[in-house]
């Protein structure tokens, strides 16, 4: 079996997983290890792009049994990013199953790994009902650069639906995530109060969904300190 990957920093864990399953894996960084790809349908190929994504993905998927793809948002046009134009184009053109190694809005493998880790750490047995729910808090934290929403979107999407977890998302006003991913979670704005008695704290930065792509790196009060971890 062969797994072809188009992505960057996710590579080691995905390659290891492929090897564990008895598959061969190789990596192609689009634009670095290959020609620059043209995305637009019907484009005249007389610009800077040397190859069209239509031909590239069709050929790559012919060589693979599974195609792992990682894409990133531009954080400029929310509709463009949240419509997952790049990732959906790959799915449309591929003749084999496509696995998301992260897209413009979601990072499902990361959230799956996080869920497994927390279940292992708590000793939770799937299918059972714990005496007390595990309190998991995802808190916004400052960062010097504006970061995508894919990781927190997926984390919220998964943990808000887990019946053995009491899940809270806490952030400054104006940095709420897309409600379709946080539905079922407790939404809070007081970090100290939210962190009280937490079993797990997931500190993550994300740029604004409402004022799309805008950072909020000035809130140093939102740094997760040891004092806050001990609340």
Task: Give the positions of each predicted feature.
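Short, small-residue-biased leader/transition segments that mark boundaries at the very start
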Residues: 2-7
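Short, structured coil segments at secondary-structure junctions
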Residues: 21, 93-94, 163, 181-183
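Charged helix-capping and loop-helix junction motifs
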Residues: 51-52, 83-84, 150-154, 185, ...
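Short, conserved loop/helix-junction motifs that constitute active-site signature segments
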Residues: 129-131, 160-162, 228-231
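Conserved anion/nucleotide-ligand pocket segment
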Residues: 136-170
């Amino acid at each position: 079996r062969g797994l072809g990957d188009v992505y960057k920093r996710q590579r080691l864990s995905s390659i290891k997983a492929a090897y564990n399953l008895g598959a061969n894996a190789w990596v192609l960084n689009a634009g670095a290890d290959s020609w620059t790809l043209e995305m637009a349908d019907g484009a005249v190929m007389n610009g800077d792009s040397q190859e069209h994504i239509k031909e590239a993905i069709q050929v790559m998927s012919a060589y693979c049994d599974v195609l792992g793809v990682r894409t990133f948002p531009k954080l400029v046009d929310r509709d463009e990013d949240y419509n997952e134009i790049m990732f959906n184009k790959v799915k449309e053109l591929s003749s084999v199953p496509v696995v998301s190694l992260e897209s413009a809005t979601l990072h499902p493998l990361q959230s799956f790994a996080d869920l497994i880790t927390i279940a292992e750490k708590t000793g939770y047995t799937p299918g059972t009902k714990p005496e007390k729910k595990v309190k998991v808090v995802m808190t916004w934290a400052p960062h010097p650069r504006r970061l995508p929403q894919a990781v927190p979107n997926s984390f919220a999407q998964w943990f808000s639906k887990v019946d053995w977890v009491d899940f809270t998302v806490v952030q400054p006003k104006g940095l709420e995530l897309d409600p379709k991913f946080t539905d079922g979670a407790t939404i809070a704005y007081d970090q100290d109060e939210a962190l009280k008695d937490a079993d797990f704290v997931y500190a993550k930065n994300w740029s604004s969904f409402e004022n799309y792509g805008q950072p909020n790196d000035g809130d140093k009060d939102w740094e997760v300190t040891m004092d806050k971890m001990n609340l």
